[in-house]
Amino acid sequence: MTHVKLAIIGSGPAGYTAAIYASRALLTPILFEGFFSGIAGGQLMTTTEVENFPGFPQGVLGHQLMENMKMQAQRFGTQVIAKDITSVDFSVRPFVLKSGEDTFTCDACIIATGASAKRLSIPGAGDNEFWQKGVTACAVCDGASPIFRDRDLFVIGGGDSALEEAMFLTRYGKRVFVVHRRDTLRASKAMVNKAQANEKIVFLWNSEVVKILGDSLVRSIDIFNNVEKTTVTMEAAGVFFAIGHQPNTAFLGGQLSLDENGYIITEKGSSRTSVPGVFAAGDVQDKYYRQAITSAGSGCMAALDAERFLEK
């Protein structure tokens, strides 16, 4: 059994920033990278170019930004472990963290497990159907696959992430259709203008994918127009979900107060949770901003809050 002053569960901008601050404060933290968002390092590992993170006037690749943060945390003494924490016990002191058969204890804990992409429960999209056979939730991860080259691809969603994925897919697909159930988008004006200016992107308004068909791979989809009440079948090689995220809090076992959507509730103006000594940072507690820079900022807050807690 390993004991540390501070354990950080999750990576990404929040976890790595918390680790940088905590290790510089000589708290010798241990950070569990985890794969809560499908990949260690969080959602930015599947983002191409990040143009709005301060200090990079020419932009920076998402995975490179995360690798830089990780190396910076390790430089100051953070121990990074490529494991998931599968359960916790915050009812005892020190806190108990489980990772498979391994047990760790800590005096304070920062939760930075982020949020994972949501998937629609429609015929053909299941794990035993066409999931990862043309259906995915990560264009950056899978878009370069030969099965998508010069084919018609479909992105489901109406936010910034949906349009970013659509624009990325124009590198590979013949046409990229953005399927949205309404006639207006939630995305920012800048992102909408950029997508509408791309001649390879086609918008399907008031539309919903109701069925995915194929053989060993996706071949076509049925699209329902909820205004005209009609259904059409269109050839398709890929379907990409971009419909939001689910906070990764199931492993907590209900030991922290969560809101109606499963996000960790923190005290206003701090990272403190309902359990003293447990702090939360990043998208796991932020359903409003969900930006790399705000996640990093909240990681800093969590480290400072944890440091003050441990000094008591």
Curated annotation (Swiss-Prot):
Family matches, as PROSITE patterns: PYRIDINE_REDOX_2 (PS00573)
Cofactor(s) the protein requires to work: FAD
Enzyme class: oxidoreductase
A cellular component term, taken from the record's GO annotations: cytoplasm
Ligand binding (FAD): 33-43, 283-292
Main location: cytoplasm
Provenance organism: Chlamydia muridarum (strain MoPn / Nigg)
Name of the protein in its database record: Thioredoxin reductase
Cofactor annotation remark: Binds 1 FAD per subunit.
Additional free-text comment from the UniProt record: The active site is a redox-active disulfide bond.
Catalysed reactions, semicolon-separated: [thioredoxin]-dithiol + NADP(+) = [thioredoxin]-disulfide + NADPH + H(+)
InterPro entries per record: FAD/NAD-bd_sf, FAD/NAD-binding_dom, Ferredoxin-NADP_redctase_2, Pyr_nucl-diS_OxRdtase_2_AS, Thioredox_Rdtase
Coiled coil ranges: none
UniProt keyword list: Cytoplasm, Disulfide bond, FAD, Flavoprotein, NADP, Oxidoreductase, Redox-active center
Family statement drawn from the similarity comment of this UniProt entry: Belongs to the class-II pyridine nucleotide-disulfide oxidoreductase family.
Disulfide bonds: C138-C141
NCBIfam families according to UniProt: TRX_reduct
Pfam families referenced in this protein's UniProt entry, alphabetically: Pyr_redox_2
EC number: 1.8.1.9
The encoding gene: trxB
